[in-house]
Design a protein with these regions (language model features):
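Transmembrane alpha-helical segments and their membrane-interface loop/helix boundaries
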Residues: 1-191
Length: 191
């Protein structure tokens, strides 16, 4: 997407120390700590810069992702509002929720995965920042520190949550099953 590329181009790239935003961050950090070179900082500046770049890019992707999410929500609301016209629409939404393949769950899972990815990157970048030397290559995290790496947790909705979210779909399906029988009873009595 051109808008994402443009936003990234004008911001901090944590892996490119020569772009304008990275130079500005370096200058501000040196001034804040009262030193002249990044090697004089009390931490590994590379890990710090990578984390700041990660935070900047995460904001960009979240902004554009939220735009897509809002569009998808609007589209699904229109589609769902028409579900009284056909039992297949209601059945589609209900079956997608029951099988955990709905758009809602996709967005929920993706947000949880992105939140975890950011936590993990922060953990790794700050480990480099706090425990390695500037310019050091081949740094390895300790086994003890690695055990502290955050774990990914995601809980799909329970059956009761699925039923609650699909009350309208269940109602429309029941109507689609019930109304033909009522019509059959009415018309069969008239003959």
């Amino acid at each position: 997407n051109a808008a994402v590329v443009e936003d990234k181009k004008n911001g901090l790239d944590g892996h490119n120390p020569w772009n304008e935003a990275a130079k500005k961050l370096e200058s501000e950090t040196l001034e804040e700590y009262g030193v002249e070179k990044v090697s004089e900082l009390p931490f590994n500046y590379s890990g710090y810069r990578m984390q700041k770049g990660e935070e900047h890019e995460a904001q960009i992707y979240k902004k554009h992702y939220d735009i897509l999410n809002k569009i998808a929500i609007k589209q699904n609301k229109v589609y769902e509002s028409l579900s009284f016209l056909s039992p297949f629409i209601s059945l589609r939404f209900l079956s997608m929720d029951v099988s955990n393949t709905s758009d809602k769950l996709h967005w929920k899972f993706t947000n949880a995965a992105e939140k975890y990815r950011l936590q993990k990157q922060e953990f790794l970048n700050y480990d480099i920042k706090d425990n390695s030397k500037y310019g050091e290559r081949g740094y390895n995290m300790t086994e003890e520190k690695f055990k502290q790496l955050p774990k990914f947790n995601f809980t799909p909705p329970t059956n009761s949550e699925i039923i609650k979210e699909n009350t309208q779909n269940i109602l429309f399906l029941c109507l689609w099953l019930f109304l033909p029988f009522v019509g059959l009873l009415i018309f069969s009595k008239n003959k």
